[in-house]
C-alpha cells in the first residue's frame, strides 16, 4: 500500500478526537476495515463534516500514517438519509454495523461483505415499514452469519442430520434450536453417538443444550432467510395461519439470531438491545 491510497467505503463508526477532528471506522471493499482521522471534521464549515457521518458511502483519498491514517478527501457516492429519520430503521442499521464490525477483517478485500451491507441498508431504508422491519433485519443478520460461515442449520436436525418436516396440524409441535449444536434439533430424534446415557440423564443433557423451541410457523420463516428475497406469507403458509402470529414470530426470530450471533462471536451488541424497545414482547 502506497503512502497515499484510494478506497471506496462506508462509515460504520465515529467518535470525536481532539478539538475538531473525528476518528472514523470505515468498511472498504478494497482493504476491509480501516480507521482514519478526519481533520477538522467537527468544524461547522468543514467539507468533510457530512461526509464522515454514519452510513455515508464515499470515494476516499487517505494518507497512510504511522499509527493512524488520515482521510484528506471524500466524494460521496451514496448515503441513507431515510435511516436517521426513523428510529426503528436507525436502530436496526446500527445493530448491523456492530455485527459487521465484529466479523470484518483488516487489510484484506471485503467486497462481498461491503456489498451485502449496503444492499441491506438500502432495503431497510427504502422498503422496510414498521410491520416489515423485523423480517428485513432478520434476513440481513442471517446473510451476514452466512458470510462468516456460521449460519444456523435450519433444514436438517443438527444431531441426526435428517430433514425436519414442519407440522402445522399439531399445535403443540416444536423443534429445538441450539446455539452450540449450530441450529435446529428434531425433538423426536436424539441420536448422539457413541455416548449412550440413561434415558433420564440423556433427556436432561439434551434439554440443557436447547436455547429455544420453535413452532412450525417460526421454523418455516427461519428457513426462508437464506433466500435472496423473502417470499410473501401466502406463498409459504396454509390459509389458516394468522398474520398476527407471523408478526410475533419475526420478532422472536430476530431475538434468536441475535443471541446466536452473540454466542458465536463471543460478544454482545449494544445497539441490538434497543431493538427490543421497538416491539416489547416476552418469550
UniProtKB/Swiss-Prot annotation:
One of its GO terms (cellular component) is bacterial nucleoid. Keywords: DNA damage, DNA recombination, DNA repair. GO terms for biological process: DNA recombination; double-strand break repair. InterPro entries: ARFGAP/RecO, DNA_rep/recomb_RecO_N, NA-bd_OB-fold, RecO, RecO_C. Signal peptide: none annotated. Involved in DNA repair and RecF pathway recombination. NCBIfam families: reco. Belongs to the RecO family. This is DNA repair protein RecO. It comes from Gloeothece citriformis (strain PCC 7424).
Amino acid at each position: 500500500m502506497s503512502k497515499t491510497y484510494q478506497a471506496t467505503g462506508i462509515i460504520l463508526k465515529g467518535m470525536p478526537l481532539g478539538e475538531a477532528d473525528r476518528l472514523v471506522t470505515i468498511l472498504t471493499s478494497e482493504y476491509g476495515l480501516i480507521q482514519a482521522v478526519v481533520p477538522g471534521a467537527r468544524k461547522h464549515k468543514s467539507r468533510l463534516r457530512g461526509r464522515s457521518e454514519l452510513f455515508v458511502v464515499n470515494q476516499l483519498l487517505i494518507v497512510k500514517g504511522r499509527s493512524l491514517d488520515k482521510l484528506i478527501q471524500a466524494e460521496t457516492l451514496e448515503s441513507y438519509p431515510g435511516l436517521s429519520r426513523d428510529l426503528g430503521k436507525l436502530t436496526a442499521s446500527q445493530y448491523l454495523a456492530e455485527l459487521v464490525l465484529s466479523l470484518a477483517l483488516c487489510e484484506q478485500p471485503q467486497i462481498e461483505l461491503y456489498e451485502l451491507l449496503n444492499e441491506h441498508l438500502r432495503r431497510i431504508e427504502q422498503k422496510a415499514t414498521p410491520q416489515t422491519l423485523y423480517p428485513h433485519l432478520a434476513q440481513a443478520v442471517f446473510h451476514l452469519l452466512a458470510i462468516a460461515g456460521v449460519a444456523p442449520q435450519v433444514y436438517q436436525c443438527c444431531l441426526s442430520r435428517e430433514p425436519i418436516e414442519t407440522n402445522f396440524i399439531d399445535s403443540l409441535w416444536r423443534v429445538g434450536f441450539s446455539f452450540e449444536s449450530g441450529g435446529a434439533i428434531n425433538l423426536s430424534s436424539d441420536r448422539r453417538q457413541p455416548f449412550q446415557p440413561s434415558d433420564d440423564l440423556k433427556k436432561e443433557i439434551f434439554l440443557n443444550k436447547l436455547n429455544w423451541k420453535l413452532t412450525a410457523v417460526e421454523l418455516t420463516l427461519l428457513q426462508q432467510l437464506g433466500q435472496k428475497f423473502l417470499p410473501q406469507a401466502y406463498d409459504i403458509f396454509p390459509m389458516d395461519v394468522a398474520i398476527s402470529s407471523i408478526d410475533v414470530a419475526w420478532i422472536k426470530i430476530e431475538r434468536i439470531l441475535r443471541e446466536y450471533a452473540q454466542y458465536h462471536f463471543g460478544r454482545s451488541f449494544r445497539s441490538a438491545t434497543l431493538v427490543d424497545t421497538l416491539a416489547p414482547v416476552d418469550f
